Design a protein with these regions (language model features):
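Extended, amphipathic, non-transmembrane alpha-helical segments
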Residues: 56-64
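Hydrophobic side-chain positions on well-ordered alpha-helices
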Residues: 64-71
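Residue-level signature of catalytic and energy-coupling elements of molecular machines
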Residues: 75
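A cross-kingdom feature marking charged/low-complexity
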Residues: 111-124
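Long C-terminal interaction segments enriched in charged/acidic composition
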Residues: 1-52, 121-217
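Solenoid-repeat scaffolds in large eukaryotic assemblies
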Residues: 79-80
Length: 217
């Protein structure tokens, strides 16, 4: 780590360049490590919000599942199918939330590693890609989370730019995209298994996760 970068890491620049105001308009100023710590805290806050949303969906899931079982036991298949369709949509959102949470957890772990190793550019580039993907998935479920994740992504992008200028390192976009896709794929796989383990299967003949029952003509 160069002396210039080490100083920027812990203390920040003492001089104010002419372009400071322009830079501050697109990314927060200041030393890198506190900005990383801020990003970690903001992501952890989003994880907490996702946990609360997951709890709400879980309660709704249990309620609808009970109605499905009741309708099924009374051989009221049209009513059971209506509830099953609703439950299928809820479980898709639950899976989306779980996927986002797991991906954000991986980003937090990486950011905390960066604070120890100073490997800013190569670690943060995949993190930004993951945030963009998670953000797009949250658009229809939590618009406020979409906005916050976009701001966090901008914060990390600013850190990457500053770190690159200080160290002379450049982003390997191919490697960054591969790493980001690996994180997202692993999160999706784990999320799917967690949903299966968490919630009971529907009675035979009714839709499972991600499926919808045919509507009555």
């Amino acid at each position: 780590m160069s002396g210039k970068f080490a100083k920027r890491w812990e203390e920040g620049y003492d001089q104010t360049p002419l372009t400071t105001k322009v830079k501050e308009a697109i990314r927060p100023p200041g030393p890198l490590k506190p900005r990383l710590d801020l990003a970690v805290r903001r992501i952890e806050l989003q994880i907490q919000r996702l946990d609360k949303a997951s709890d709400r969906f879980s309660e709704r899931d249990k309620s609808i599942f009970a109605r499905i079982v009741d309708a099924y036991s009374k051989h009221d298949m049209p009513r059971a199918n209506v509830f099953a369709n609703e439950l299928a949509e809820i479980r898709k959102m639950e899976k989306m939330i779980m996927h986002a949470r797991l991906a954000l957890e991986q980003i937090v772990l990486r950011l905390k590693t960066v604070s120890e190793l100073g490997d800013v550019v190569t670690t943060l580039a995949p993190a930004v890609s993951v945030l963009r993907s998670v953000r797009s998935g949250m658009a229809t479920v939590f618009p406020e989370a979409e906005t916050e994740l976009g701001q966090i992504g901008n914060l990390l992008s600013g850190i990457i730019i500053d770190a690159g200028q200080s160290t002379g390192l450049t982003i390997n976009f191919e490697s960054a995209n591969e790493d980001a896709q690996k994180i997202l794929t692993e999160a999706a796989t784990v999320a799917e298994q967690k949903i299966k383990d968490k919630f009971p299967e529907l009675p035979a003949g009714l839709p499972s996760i991600g499926e919808k029952a045919p509507t009555e003509a």
